[in-house]
Amino acid sequence: MKTEEGTIAVDNAVYTNIAGYAATNCFGVKGMAVRSMTDGLVHLLRKEAMGKGVRVTFQSDNSIAIDLHIMVDKGVNIRAISASIIKEVRYFVTKSTGTEVSAVNVFVDSITID
């Protein structure tokens, strides 16, 4: 990101951590998810590893696109949760980094059944 004073470089981990934090604070989200390459199963990530459930792609217009892989609680409205996540992630990432978010894509990989 270029400013009048110089260039600011934001590490990819900053974006993934902010996006993961914003998503997991939304109602009905159990946590971030990752699919195992060995067995194909979806695993719930611990708080310190939630960035693994997020992928950030840098666009040619200096904006970013964010893909989120999540687990949700049983009985929640997935459409409503996804809309809430998109709004929260876009807001927190833009507010924290000053980077425009061009897209937030939510992938519900699993539903927890207690």
Predicted regions and their residues:
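Contiguous, often N-terminal, cationic amphipathic patches that form binding interfaces
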Residues: M1-K74, A83, K95, T99-D114
